[in-house]
Amino acid sequence: DKIEKYRQDNQDIMFTKDTHYTNYLTTREGRYIPIEHCIIDTEGHGLYGEVAKYEKHAKKVFNKTSFGSIDLAKYISRSDYEEVEFCGVVSNICVLSNIIMTQTYNEKVEIKVDLKATKGMDDEIDNTLKKYLEQLTVRVKE
């Protein structure tokens, strides 16, 4: 519903995609999280479920090989966006990393997170995420 509303309102929609290669298990992340996932050119690299149908409507899709996307943060810094909203998974890893990178490259853009459209690995993380985001000066929607 959120993506569809943004699309109907002619808002820019962007996605980041976790992107790994067949050598994933030899990377730093792969050594700490030894579960092959999001391997490029496999079904697991695609956007999941209903979200996948919106990829063709995206202004931009960023493949990222680490938790955050420097390319996304730089893209936002070159834009005229006054506000950006983040949502997705995994809240305490990829979403949080992208927020921090965006803050690093963009001192003026307002950053929002919709907690109803963001999920972490467990309930404890989800229950404490709001506090961390607010301390990072992120506007939190519930």
PLM regions: where:
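Short amphipathic alpha-helical segment that frequently serves as the phosphate-/nucleotide-binding helix
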Residues: 1
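Active-site-adjacent betaalpha module
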Residues: 4-12, 27-142
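PIN/NYN-family metal-dependent endoribonuclease catalytic core
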Residues: 10-23
